[in-house]
From Swiss-Prot:
Catalyzes the condensation of ATP and 5-phosphoribose 1-diphosphate to form N'-(5'-phosphoribosyl)-ATP (PR-ATP). Has a crucial role in the pathway because the rate of histidine biosynthesis seems to be controlled primarily by regulation of HisG enzymatic activity. This is ATP phosphoribosyltransferase. GO terms for cellular component: cytoplasm. GO terms for molecular function: ATP binding; ATP phosphoribosyltransferase activity.
Length: 213
């Protein structure tokens, strides 16, 4: 039986809808009364695991799940050893540099050498500023990153932005987009190569469904 890692949070509803279109029903995960983290589809074809978004690539890399859905942002941040199968065309957002609207720094390149940048995406932020050849200190924050500049702990942040509303409400503005992110279908490399449990057929059904939507 194929095991699929599904992400809690913003991507869950669209992920479940995608699988429903190919005949797999994990909609119980959307029930507010549900406490199960593992659900077998009524057809007994596959089972779903409900995990934190950051853990999806871990379950897939280690083979506890053969398929998973995860944001492109996490694939760049974590660089897991997984097979990248498809862009699922939902969950669109962007990784951006933002500063206070009153900041004297209106582009990332204007930030002072050894300035401070708060982010939960430490590797993405490091890579970006290394490419700029600008030495900065990346401060890892895993809660409300916007508080970095508000409290004076950092001059800027690197974070995911969807509508930009949270930034605006906290007096921040985007000054650069690092990349755009959408949900991606990933697979355990060996399972995919060996086509265990007809994994390739299922992944093709998913790709076909995405192309038709």
């Amino acid at each position: 039986m194929i095991t699929i890692a599904l992400p809690k949070g913003a991507l869950l509803s669209d992920s479940i809808e995608l699988f429903k279109r190919i005949g797999l029903d994990f909609s119980s995960f959307l029930d507010s009364k549900n406490r199960q983290l593992q659900i077998i589809d009524p057809t007994n074809t596959a089972q779903g695991l409900l995990v934190r978004a950051t853990d999806v690539p871990v379950y897939v890399e280690y083979g506890q799940a053969q398929l998973g859905i995860v944001g492109y942002d996490l694939l760049l941040e974590k660089s897991p050893d997984v097979a990248h199968l498809a862009d699922l065309n939902f969950g669109g957002c962007r990784m951006s540099v933002a500063v206070p609207k009153t900041s004297p720094y209106q582009t990332p390149a204007e930030l002072p050498p050894n300035g401070k940048v708060a982010s939960k995406f430490v590797n993405c932020a490091k890579t970006y500023f290394q490419q700029l050849d600008l030495p900065v200190e990346i401060i890892p924050l895993y809660g409300s990153v916007e508080l970095g500049p508000i409290t004076g702990m950092s001059e800027a942040i690197v974070d995911l932005v969807s509508t930009g509303r949270t930034l605006k409400e906290n007096g921040l503005v985007e000054v650069e987009t690092l990349f755009h992110s959408t949900a991606r279908l990933i697979a355990h490399p060996l399972s995919y190569r060996l086509n265990l449990d007809n994994l390739n057929d299922l992944s093709e059904q998913i790709k076909n469904s995405v192309s038709k939507s």
